Amino acid sequence: MDIKKILVIGSGAIKVAEAAEFDYSGSQALKAFREEGIKTVLVNPNIATIQTSKFLADRVYFIPIQRQFLAEVIEQERPDAIACGFGGQTALSACVDLDEAGVLEKYGVRVVGTPVRGIKRALSRDLFQKAMREAGIPVPPSSPAKSPEEAIEIARYLGYPVVVRVSFNLGGAGAFVARSEEALKARIYKAFAQSAIGEVLVEKYLEGWKEIEFEVVRDAYDNVAAVVCMENIDPMGVHTGDSIVVAPCLTLTDEEYQTARNISIGVVRTIELIGEGNVQVAINYAGPEQYAIETNPRMSRSSALASKASGYPLAYIAAKLALGYRLDEVLNQVTRRTVASFEPALDYIVVKHPRWESDRFGVTEGLGPEMMSIGEAMGIGRTLEEAWQKAVRMIDIGEPGLVGGPMFQSLTLEEALKCIKDYVPYWPICAAKAIYLGVSVEEIYKINKVDKFFLNAIKRIVDVYKRLEAGEVDLDEAKVLGFSDWQIAKALGKSVDEIRAMRRRPVVKKIDTLAGEWPADTNYLYLTYGGQYDDKTPGVDYLVVGAGVFRIGVSVEFDWSTVTLATELKNRGYRVAILNYNPETVSTDWDIVDKLYFDEISVERVLDIVEKEGNGVTVVLYAGGQIGQRLYVPLEKVGVKIGGTRAKSIDMAEDRGKFSKLLDRLGIKQPPWLYAASVEEAVKLAEGLGFPVLLRPSYVLGGTYMAVAYNKEELINFLSKAAKVSGEYPVVISKFMPRGIEAEVDAVSDGVKIVATPIEHIEPPGVHSGDSTMVLPPRRLEEWAVKKMIDIAHTLAVELEVKGPLNVQFIVQDDVYVIEANLRVSRSMPLVSKATGVNYMSLVADVLTHGRLAVDEERITLKPSKWWVKSPQFSWARLRGAYPRLGPVMYSTGEVASNGSVFEEALLKSWLSATPNKIPSKTALIYTYDPHHEELLRQAAGLLSWRLEIYTPEQLGGKIAEMLKWRKIDIVMTAGITPEKDFHVRRTAADTNTPLVLDSTLAVELAKAFNWYYKNGKLEVAPW
């Protein structure tokens, strides 16, 4: 193919069902294209990604992934081709839109990889069904519908239960199971609202059938390889993104396996796939029937998992195939021994486990066909039990495995059985407790139809746990079944140190994709008790600890810092390893560092690795966010060499009591605060300070269980929950200052000098910094306040002997008040690095390797030359039953950013980059039931009334839901937390993809920016 320049479309902000796996696949594609000498142009407003760093793409555009912006990029750049398969559903839909609008034809841009007709055939439920039937590939009894009435008719014909699936959408958005006509009518409007083309498929629900998935690659010459077979432990009806998944497939007969493989290959041929795709197949547990359910003609969450599970670099190979290579011409870069037509063989088992945040959002529903999980982890072991228990620890919910943790201990039999029946998140822990209390595997199978093979694995774990509790010590058996030292110690009534001294050490094994069939030199490692000898690899100088499972508050920003820091160390000539277990990420890719340990981030595992690597290795804990903070004290205690800031400084900053005393000693102001060790004491102290008060437990991230209490009842209600987070630590009560401006400083220090960037938030204090709209350089803050913020950050860096990254948060009112300091990489460091043009991780690497910053001045303040705005991405539409709101708890799942020569331009481009935001053209619903926000929302309504028809709930009465459903309201602006009054309004807005603005200050700023745009303000399309 004669391609000189290619346009790659990213996936934008991280949201439920579209996460960091597209940073991984996009980064790999950019590398593969660059190897061929092709110039790459990337459009992706996700500032936190690695792919938007200078070293991967030739040009990067931080702009919304919408047709008018993409058309301008094409006009300016004139690419020869466009790659649609590496940015998830967002990129595919954008490509189809550009094609249908005639933009690609107008500029002569070719689609590389799967053709647009193939994409449509895969994503339209109607076209998919027709194509499969024509090709003789079995599909479930089903029919497409273009209206709710048609859907109801089809369901009557098929008979209940039915599952409704949505065309052209992401992660099963809007999909649901209906067991009656009433249930169908209640949710069908949301399904249509979630479809880009207003089409759904009504399908007979294959209850209890097995669901498996094949990752398949195909070249332009019709050569096909079925790379990995993955099996969902949960049966049909639970979205594959919310299922626990094992690879390879474990419960299929050879005949079932071959049939499913043939169906998958038939599907990709029918849609003319070129590159990589996945096919979901349903297998009847009671008979020979199998059906093709759906396909994704692109890299997906499953393909990221399959790549990491098999050591087969799917995204890299898919990019080469898109350029016209044959499978047998592409070398597998992991093994350097095999070509892409070689199907991997696995001599280990992987278990992928999702992580949910249902508590945070107040969601109580069980799992279904619409994906709701926020992150995922992948455990690797030589037994199913080992991999599974590892995966449960990795999702970091406080459980030490399938048995022995707080959830396991507290469940009653009744609760456990209900949890299994409803597929509540983490149901395998409930199954373990039910078995522990005497329920048989057969009974559990009858309730939830999970294959007995998997239930028996849980039973084996429970049996060993019972024997440990009875004092029978067989450490080897427990370790082979994935028990941690802590689990064993607790069951035996011994200390963790005693168990460590008693047990044998794990061995290091390589993932070589060949199951040892012939030698392959890979750097992709895991630790296991299912072996006797280590696979030998040369030692490293640094072990950089990654961010682990993604969750609210920990996302791709921390992967950016892990990878960027590791790369900077490698560029300085050091040998570097990364420890991480998140299959979505770039940090768990094979070609980033000298060694990848795909394993747990825990004291036990880090000590195992340090023993293997030798005492010369320096462990770096501050790049991955909060997960590393917990390891400082226990690792330093046993003499592990830790790079950068010392453990005592971390503890001083993390412990709110110690930190406050430090601020008092240094004469730095902070909002008045007090400690409470009990609820009664808290009530008394809060009344003394005067409501409202802010409540913060010690050691949290993402604002978990932080709250503003406006009265005594709210305070008591909150504290009963907060104890769940950190029972040993008291709660801090501080005076809440809602009138100030919240701001922060990102910095790097060597304990003497500091390089820093100030950031301002649009939303007031009380909105979590991760949910705030950030502005660089500060716009409302006066110069004295910015200077004082930098002074304070410098003073703290010197006092705490910071050797590395630092983030300090402030409220500026009549003076500058410090809220908190974090001695680690912050969520905003990718933003400040890209906005200022100075890579903060390069500065961190200087301090780590040489002990000092390579700058002359004591204090350097960096500010960008343009306006930059970072906006949060919320996933309210995904979280069934959640009440959309803002507060001190973080709710956003991702972020986007853009720049502009004026503030309004930067704000609008950034805000438009988050879905489902669009500039309103006709109508707006603007209201609040919270007196604190009335004045500002009145102002916003006044600013827009010349151009838009402004509604209030009182005017519309019972018509609101209908108007939202039929897209008669362009935007909803509201504020405050009043679910008893407006739950239905906000929920319907989220379900119908209506833009929601949930803060009054932001509403005013957006109203001004809309007016600027209405009066011919220009949204420039320019590369970074």
From Swiss-Prot:
It is an enzyme of class 6 (ligase). Mn(2+) 4 binds at residues 820, 822. Residues 917-1024 form the MGS-like domain. One of its GO terms (cellular component) is cytoplasm. The keyword Ligase applies. SMART domains: CPSase_L_D3. Mg(2+) 3 binds at residues 809, 820. Binds 4 Mg(2+) or Mn(2+) ions per subunit. Mn(2+) 1 binds at residues 280, 294. Residues 536-917 are annotated as: Carbamoyl phosphate synthetic domain. Pathway: Amino-acid biosynthesis; L-arginine biosynthesis; carbamoyl phosphate from bicarbonate: step 1/1; Pyrimidine metabolism; UMP biosynthesis via de novo pathway; (S)-dihydroorotate from bicarbonate: step 1/3. It catalyses: hydrogencarbonate + L-glutamine + 2 ATP + H2O = carbamoyl phosphate + L-glutamate + 2 ADP + phosphate + 2 H(+). Its cofactor is Mg(2+); Mn(2+). Residues 1-396 are annotated as: Carboxyphosphate synthetic domain. ATP 1 binds at residues 125, 165, 171-172, 204, 206, 211, 237-239, 280, 294. Residues 918-1024 are annotated as: Allosteric domain. HAMAP family: CPSase_L_chain_A (MF_01210_A). Large subunit of the glutamine-dependent carbamoyl phosphate synthetase (CPSase). CPSase catalyzes the formation of carbamoyl phosphate from the ammonia moiety of glutamine, carbonate, and phosphate donated by ATP, constituting the first step of 2 biosynthetic pathways, one leading to arginine and/or urea and the other to pyrimidine nucleotides. Belongs to the CarB family. Composed of two chains; the small (or glutamine) chain promotes the hydrolysis of glutamine to ammonia, which is used by the large (or ammonia) chain to synthesize carbamoyl phosphate. Tetramer of heterodimers (alpha,beta)4. This is Carbamoyl phosphate synthase large chain. The gene is carB.
